[in-house]
A protein has these predicted regions:
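Conserved acetyl-CoA-binding loop-helix of GNAT-fold acetyltransferases
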Residues: 119-132, 144
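Conserved active-site alpha-helix within GNAT-family acetyltransferase domains
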Residues: 146-172
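Conserved GNAT acetyl-CoA-binding A-motif
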Residues: 134-147
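Active-site rim helix/loop that mediates acceptor-substrate recognition in acyltransferases
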Residues: 47-81
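A short beta-loop-alpha structural element at the N-terminal edge
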Residues: 31-45
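C-terminal "cap" of GNAT-fold acetyltransferases
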Residues: 15-20, 165-191
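Conserved beta-strand in the GNAT
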Residues: 75, 89-100, 104-112
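Conserved glycine-rich acetyl-CoA-binding loop
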Residues: 114-125, 137, 154
Length: 191
């Protein structure tokens, strides 16, 4: 029997398109909200990713790439209002994308958390959001290419050989300065 999107969301226990929150462990006055990205997040996403790519910790993302894949992104933002370029008056502190690659395969991409918010479970919650969405779409294999495999192992992923991934995933890699000598580690989780 066909289940509507709403029924599938309810079965998953979470509606991926509505925000959720966590409290920062060492600062109970700070709350981080997780939601899908909005058009006004693009500049903040670009700045976050650029900071990591300049440090060699992440592959760069162009503005056009962020716009094209905006629907893939989850955002983590503080509940504390700030002034500046932030989308809704809150500070964007992390982001992550789930990119569907093939029939039963998706990639977690562009996982980044601002340095002051690192090691506060924000990255773990962003991954969890992506895994819930993958489950909603009945995708059971989720991989990532990462410079931080231990973080993904902590979150239930296993290291795999890059040769286990389909050739299609390398289409993004052609424009990378490190292609074909990729120094990232491939990790995968099966739901």
């Amino acid at each position: 029997m066909y289940k509507s999107g709403k029924e599938r969301f309810e079965k998953a226990g979470v509606d991926i398109y509505f925000p959720s929150k966590i409290e920062i462990e060492d600062d109970p006055n700070k709350v981080v909200i997780f939601r899908k990205a909005l058009m006004c997040d693009v500049k903040s996403l670009y700045n976050l990713f650029s900071e990591y790519s300049k440090a060699g910790e992440m592959l760069p993302r162009s503005m056009i790439d962020i716009y094209v894949h905006l629907r893939d992104y989850y955002i983590a933002e503080t509940e504390i209002e700030t002034e500046g370029e932030e989308c809704r008056g809150y500070e964007l502190v992390g982001a992550c994308a789930l990119s569907i690659v093939w029939e039963n395969l998706a990639e977690i991409r562009s996982l980044a958390v601002k340095k002051p918010y690192a090691r506060k479970k924000i990255g773990t919650e962003l991954i969890r959001k992506c895994l819930i969405e993958a489950n909603f779409f009945k995708i059971t294999k989720i991989f990532a290419l990462t410079y931080k495999p231990q973080f993904f192992i902590y979150n239930g992923f296993k290291i795999i050989e890059k040769s286990e991934l389909p050739h299609k995933i390398w289409s993004d890699c052609i424009n990378c300065v490190k292609f074909p000598d990729c120094d990232e580690t491939a990790v995968m989780i099966q739901l």
